[in-house]
């Protein structure tokens, strides 16, 4: 009887979530067939292009692309957030900001759009390798968040 109730609960939860339109986030969902990306730092630009390619959206030159994106600025900063009593860093804040504009083929540029992602993490000199790896993962997650936000805004534009 308990197994039946557990299965019934799980099934009803799945039905409820699917009925309300809930979807797990997956790859980039876009309503355009090709994109051109210029500007920005080489590492961010490369990551952005890779994410669009993984979603099946080809990267074209500006003359052939349906959407044209120009990254005006992408800036990553690392700020000390707090110190221990001895003056050692105990917490950092990571900020990643991207300013860009886009247009469809044969239309004027839209206004500049700035998006940002912030993360904080604790720091300990005793775990320097682990904390460096944590920082890399946080930065990668911030880039993914910014890229998904950009893709959503591009898809919602006419």
PLM feature spans:
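Bacterial N-terminal signal peptides that target proteins for export
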Residues: 1-9
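C-terminal motif of bacterial Sec signal peptides marking the signal peptidase cleavage site
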Residues: 16-19
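Bacterial signal peptide processing site
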Residues: 21-24
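Acidic/histidine-rich, surface-exposed loop or edge segments in extracytoplasmic proteins
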Residues: 29-35, 126-131
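N-terminal segment of the mature soluble domain
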Residues: 31-75
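Sec/Tat-exported extracytoplasmic proteins
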Residues: 52, 56, 102, 106, ...
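Surface-exposed short loop/turn segments
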Residues: 70-114, 121-133, 148
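C-terminal/domain-edge helix-coil "capping" segments
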Residues: 129-158
């Amino acid at each position: 009887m308990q197994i039946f109730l557990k299965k019934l609960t799980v099934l009803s939860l799945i039905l409820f979530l699917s009925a309300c339109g809930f979807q797990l986030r997956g790859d980039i969902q876009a309503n355009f067939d090709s994109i051109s990306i210029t500007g920005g730092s080489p590492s961010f630009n490369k990551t952005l292009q890779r994410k669009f390619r993984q979603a099946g959206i080809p990267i074209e030159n500006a003359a052939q692309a349906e959407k044209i994106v120009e990254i005006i600025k992408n800036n990553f900063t690392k700020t000390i957030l707090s110190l221990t009593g001895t003056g050692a860093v105990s917490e950092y804040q990571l900020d990643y900001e991207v300013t860009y504009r886009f247009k469809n083929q044969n239309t004027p540029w839209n206004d500049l759009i700035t998006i940002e992602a912030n993360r904080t993490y604790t720091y300990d000199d005793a775990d320097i390798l682990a904390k460096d790896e944590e920082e890399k993962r946080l930065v990668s997650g911030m880039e993914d968040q910014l890229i998904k936000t950009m893709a959503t805004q591009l898809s919602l534009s006419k």
